[in-house]
Amino acid sequence: MGATAGWAVTVYDKPASFFKEAPLDLQHRLFMKLGSTHSPFRARSEPEDPDTERSAFTERDSGSGLVTRLHERPALLVSSTSWTEFEQLTLDGQNLPSLVCVITGKGPLREYYSRLIHQKHFQHIQVCIPWLEGRGLPPLLGSVDLDVCLDTSSSGLDLPMKVVDMFRCCLPACAVNFKCLHELVKHEENRLVFEDSEELAAQLQYFADAFLKLS
């Protein structure tokens, strides 16, 4: 907010230009790099050609160098969180198809939530919690299939910058509702809004069904 001659002007955040949909070649290189330290990004099976480079989501042909998406790849979901007490949602993923959840960010409750996540016994969901330095996050956001925004505001007045970044990356997103979110996210118009874990689970199921039809 800025005050000018007694009246207020609302100024909205804009995403940086480096937030954008990532080319498939860049996605593949990112997946291979993350696969060196995070098993959910590694190939589920070995390619017939040992020279073919394969991740959990993509593969590069050894002859042409062409990168393609795998047909039976898992969906890739990202949630970038500050790991605070305002971001407390649990999810029972028993009815979801194959899904890789990447949760990034740094905050006071990171280790606490990490322990809770690893106590879960999901059938089809893999979770990894990388810490991406500097400009490591934009390529990931430009490569995933869905974002889940758990950002809220203790004041109810701060809009989540992370959703703005998702818009720039042309990502579908599900955002947890709070007081002023409607200024940015319009439910079923530009993104989806949820109130609790049950609504989020229903939205994820809807997304998963659509993903399976397209993949």
Curated annotation (Swiss-Prot):
Q: Transferase: present as a keyword of the record?
A: yes
- Residue ranges, annotated region (Disordered): 40-66
EC no.?
2.4.1.-
Which InterPro entries does the UniProt entry name for this protein?
ALG1-like (IPR026051), Glyco_trans_1 (IPR001296)
The enzyme's first-digit EC class, named in words, is transferase
Q: Which UniProt keywords apply?
A: Glycosyltransferase, Transferase
According to the UniProt record, one GO cellular component term is: endoplasmic reticulum
Q: Name one GO biological process term.
A: protein glycosylation
Under the GO molecular function aspect, what terms does this record hold?
mannosyltransferase activity
The answer on whether this UniProt entry bears the keyword Cytoplasm reads no
What does this gene product do? Putative glycosyltransferase.
Tell me the protein family, please. Belongs to the glycosyltransferase group 1 family.
Matching PANTHER family: BETA1,4 MANNOSYLTRANSFERASE (PTHR13036), GLYCOSYLTRANSFERASE ALG1L2-RELATED (PTHR13036:SF2)
Under which name does UniProt file this protein? Putative glycosyltransferase ALG1L2
Q: Which organism is it from?
A: Homo sapiens
